[in-house]
Amino acid sequence: GESTRPGAEPVPVAEEIRRVVPVIEALAVEGALISIDSRRAEVMRAAVNAGARIINDVSALSGAGALEAAADLGVPVILMHMQGEPGTMQDNPSYGDVVAEVRDGLLARAQACREAGIAAKDIALDPGIGFGKTVAHNLALLAHLDSLTATGHPVVLGVSRKSYIARIDRDVPPGERVAGSVATALAAWDQGVRLFRVHDVAEHRQALAVY
């Protein structure tokens, strides 16, 4: 309902709800497992009431009322790390130790979730590749995903077609980044990641099945 890509502008809450609820209701009828990607408590409540069963928040439930809403709704959550806001997060991302800071930031949010009543088994962590990070930051995180899998929380990885692949390989357009996406998924699998957010489902499924 609201894009969180670099440079994206916010969408009013009512408009976000208008966009997502009919789609969720239609998918829920078909028995699909649906995740709502939102930073807003009101959208989370409307989406879960419409049939969503997972909350994915790029701001790790740090927005007004978001943590309380997730706890009240009693569904699993995905906490993503993001430095800054979508509109400006890529302007000048800076870390002392990106691996440690992302891990510790996510663990702090996971602790807040547990204190709010969300079970540890229902909390997944996402390092937020491309969200307030340079290519060097992204590559460091990808090389040390085991720092997150070692926490015991499920780890979710979203790298499909992202721009770091183009920075490495001739600035190829999104449609030509499938091989790089699959390669990253295989490397992440070796570090214990089991949940992947992808565009090209068949290609990733086949690669992981063979691997």
Where do the protein language model's features map onto the residues?
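Active-site metal-binding loops of divalent metal-dependent hydrolases
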Residues: I129
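Short coil/turn linkers that connect adjacent helices within long alpha-helical scaffolds
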Residues: A116-I118
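Active-site-adjacent loop and "lid" segments of alpha/beta metabolic enzymes
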Residues: T4-L33, R39-E42, V48-N49, R53-A112, ...
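Short acidic capping loops at alpha-helix termini that bridge into adjacent secondary structure
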Residues: A120-D122
